[in-house]
Each structure stands twice: as C-alpha cells, then as structure tokens.
C-alpha cells in the first residue's frame, strides 16, 4: 500500500473546482496537526487558505500549493468520472491528479516521514495552501503572503508543487517565471457605409501598420535564465457582422511574457510610442498579472537536484518557461523559490492523470530535499 497514493485519491475524490476546497484542506490539516504543525486558517471571501508551521527557528522551508482544480469539461468525454480516482494501466486518473493533488499528498507524507526520522530537525517547516490558484487568484496565496509580510515572516526555501516534469519525473525544475502584462487596446474610427469609405475611417486599416510594427519589435534579448520578451495577440474584434458596414472601432487583446531585461513600465512606454507614431485615436487598459522572478542556483536547487538524481536518476534542468503560478506572490517573501512536481502532459485536459509509479518517488524527492536542508548532521 502507498500512503501517498491513498491520500492523493482521497483528495481527488473531493470536487474542488476553483474556488471551492470541499474538505481537501481539512484532510491535510488533520495530518499536519498530528505531527506538531500549528495551523492558521485564513479564509477570504469564498476562498479557503491555511498557513501551517512546525518550529519557530530559521531557516524556514515551505511547501506551497493549491487544492482547487479547473473545471472538468464534458463529463461524457472522460473515460471514468473525474472525481472518482481510478487506476488503469499504471496511471491514476482524476481531475487534479497532476495539478496538483499528487503533489499535495506528497507534501504531507514527506513531512510525516521527515519529522518521524528527524523530530529535532533544524529550522522550521511550513505549508501554504490555497483554493484560489486556478481562478482569479485574488483571495488566495497573495492574501496569505500579505499577512506574513505584515508581521515580518520570511521564507528561506520554498517549493511550489506545480507539475513541472516533462518526459520523466525530475527532468525539469522551474527556478523562475517570466512576468505577464496584458493590454486591451481599442482603436477608434468612424462607422460608415462600405461603399463610401471617404465618409468613414476604418479602424482596422488604421491599426494594421501599428500592429505589424508591434509584432515585429524585438523587445529585449533575454538573458542567461530567460528567453527574449514575447508579445502576442490573443483576440481581435471589430465589425457589426454585416458585410456593408465599416466598423467604428477595433478591439485588440494582447499579452507580454517578459524577462527581467524589461520592466512593465518600459514595455508600456514603447507601446505608447508606436501607437502615437501611427497617429491612432485609442484607449489602452493594462493588467499586470505578475513580475518576473529568478532563483539562481544555490542551496535549494542543489538539494532538490541531488534528491532527484538519487531517487529518480534524472538530471534536473533549470527552466523559466511556461505560464505564471503563485510563485509570483510568494517570491516577495522567499529568498529561494522553485517549482517542482509530476509530469505535466495531461494537466487541464480530459482524462488528467499521473503515473502511479511516480507518486511515492515524488514524496521521496521532497523528503530528501528536506533532509538536505534541515536534517541535523
């Protein structure tokens, strides 16, 4: 029997579509309190969060993650019910299996085993858990971080249990993430009859040269840890649906994924310069979802990489690719932060799953990392 697999199945059984928790955190809290963790529940709005800590001394090691999952999609497209964990052909199926209930289970059993073997370990252990990561993420991890920051509590080492592995368990560790800056651009024209263009101003035509320049711009060159900043259009909307009407405005949604070689303000300024150069009448609204961050190789990456090599035999590659996570909030108070978890090939998909054979090794990697950083000599 596998204690980690059993707990993962219990977590998957709970229909915790964001922002609901549905009792996942209660399961974890019961196990953590039994090994000496002091738990603070921090509910905000419809979101359940908790901060659990064992010990008062430094250094502080934190596991961070989320109990919420994305919606299932069409139930009839699943081979088995998404909230009835099912093992088939060596795979554990269920919504959240990879993102990230296997990691949550592995956090708990890793702590249980580490504390049993090292009851007087150095420093402190903590878990920061939310049910608001897959949604709007305004009442979750960021609120807990605000509370910790307000009382001067900082984290030395943090592992966020996001599914980072690609081909085999342990092949990829995320030691940073790009920033995310989105924009909503509305270019104004004058609506009119398509047969009388001299009496109208077509905002699509007006925007096209600026759009071409934005798409061709090299924003920066990146650096040793990050690829160059990218700018991508996600949506363009204009027109009434009729073929004989020149639209009065055109709306464009776009996103920057940016390296630390650029700032949100520098990117905004360059966009304004391009739009103004083309003489557009426009409105532009911005949303900054996260700043870029990096954890250079150090004690945490060394301990985690050594644990991965010992348990799975993989050589971990440090990477900053991919989307944003709650690491963007935690890094404010964390000296060293990485993301590491199971294979991510099926996350957010129908028939989400993890390799059963990876579940206990994942817990072992987390435990070995703890030993590398907090076990007394």
From Swiss-Prot:
It is an enzyme of class 3 (hydrolase). Transmembrane segments: none annotated. It comes from the Bacteria. GO terms for molecular function: acetylornithine deacetylase activity; cobalt ion binding; succinyl-diaminopimelate desuccinylase activity; zinc ion binding. Its cofactor is Zn(2+); Co(2+). Its EC number is 3.5.1.18. Pathway: Amino-acid biosynthesis; L-lysine biosynthesis via DAP pathway; LL-2,6-diaminopimelate from (S)-tetrahydrodipicolinate (succinylase route): step 3/3. Keywords: Amino-acid biosynthesis, Cobalt, Diaminopimelate biosynthesis, Hydrolase, Lysine biosynthesis, Metal-binding, Zinc. The active site is at 68, 133 (proton acceptor). Zn(2+) 2 binds at residues 99, 134, 348. InterPro entries: Bact_exopeptidase_dim_dom, DapE_proteobac, Peptidase_M20, Peptidase_M20_dimer, Peptidase_M20A. Pfam families: M20_dimer, Peptidase_M20. Gene3D superfamilies: 3.30.70.360, Zn peptidases (3.40.630.10). Zn(2+) 1 binds at residues 66, 99, 162. It catalyses: N-succinyl-(2S,6S)-2,6-diaminopimelate + H2O = (2S,6S)-2,6-diaminopimelate + succinate. Binds 2 Zn(2+) or Co(2+) ions per subunit. GO terms for biological process: diaminopimelate biosynthetic process; L-arginine biosynthetic process; lysine biosynthetic process via diaminopimelate. Homodimer. Belongs to the peptidase M20A family. DapE subfamily. NCBIfam families: dapE_proteo, PRK13009.1. Catalyzes the hydrolysis of N-succinyl-L,L-diaminopimelic acid (SDAP), forming succinate and LL-2,6-diaminopimelate (DAP), an intermediate involved in the bacterial biosynthesis of lysine and meso-diaminopimelic acid, an essential component of bacterial cell walls. This is Succinyl-diaminopimelate desuccinylase. The lineage of its organism: Bacteria, Pseudomonadati, Pseudomonadota, Betaproteobacteria, Neisseriales.
């Amino acid at each position: 029997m596998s204690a980690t697999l059993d707990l993962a199945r219990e977590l998957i059984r709970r229909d915790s579509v964001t922002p609901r928790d549905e009792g996942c955190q209660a399961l974890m809290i019961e196990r953590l309190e039994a090994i000496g963790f002091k738990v603070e529940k921090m509910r905000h709005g419809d979101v359940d969060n908790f901060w659990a800590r064992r010990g008062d001394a430094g250094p502080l090691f934190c596991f961070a993650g989320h109990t919420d999952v994305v919606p299932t999609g069409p139930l009839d497209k699943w081979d088995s019910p998404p909230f009835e964990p099912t093992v088939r052909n060596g795979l554990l199926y269920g919504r959240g299996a990879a993102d990230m209930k296997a990691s949550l289970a592995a956090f708990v059993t890793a702590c249980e085993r580490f504390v049993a073997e090292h009851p007087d370990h150095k420093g402190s252990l903590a878990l920061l858990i939310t049910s608001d990561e897959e949604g709007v993420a305004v009442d979750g991890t960021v609120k807990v971080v605000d509370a910790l920051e307000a009382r001067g509590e900082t984290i030395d080492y943090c592992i966020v249990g996001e599914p980072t592995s690609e081909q085999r368990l342990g092949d990829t560790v995320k030691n940073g993430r790009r920033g995310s800056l989105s924009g909503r651009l509305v270019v104004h024209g004058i609506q009119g009859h398509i047969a009388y263009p001299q009496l109208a101003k077509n905002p699509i035509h007006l925007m096209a040269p600026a759009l071409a320049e934005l798409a061709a711009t090299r924003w920066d060159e990146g650096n040793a840890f990050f690829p160059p900043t990218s700018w991508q259009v996600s949506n363009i909307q204009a027109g009434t649906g009729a073929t004989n009407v020149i639209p009065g405005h055109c709306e464009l949604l776009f996103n920057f994924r940016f390296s630390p070689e650029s700032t949100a303000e520098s990117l905004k300024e360059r966009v304004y310069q391009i739009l103004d150069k083309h003489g557009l009448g426009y409105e532009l609204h911005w949303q900054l979802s996260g700043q870029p961050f990096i954890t250079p190789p150090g004690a945490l990456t060394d301990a985690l990489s050594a644990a991965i090599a010992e348990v799975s035999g993989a050589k971990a590659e440090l990477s900053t690719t991919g989307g944003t996570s709650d690491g963007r909030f935690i890094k404010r108070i964390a000296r060293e932060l990485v993301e590491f978890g199971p294979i991510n090939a099926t996350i957010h998909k129908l028939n989400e799953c993890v390799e059963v054979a990876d579940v206990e090794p994942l817990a072992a990697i987390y435990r070995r990392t703890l030993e590398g950083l907090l076990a007394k000599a």
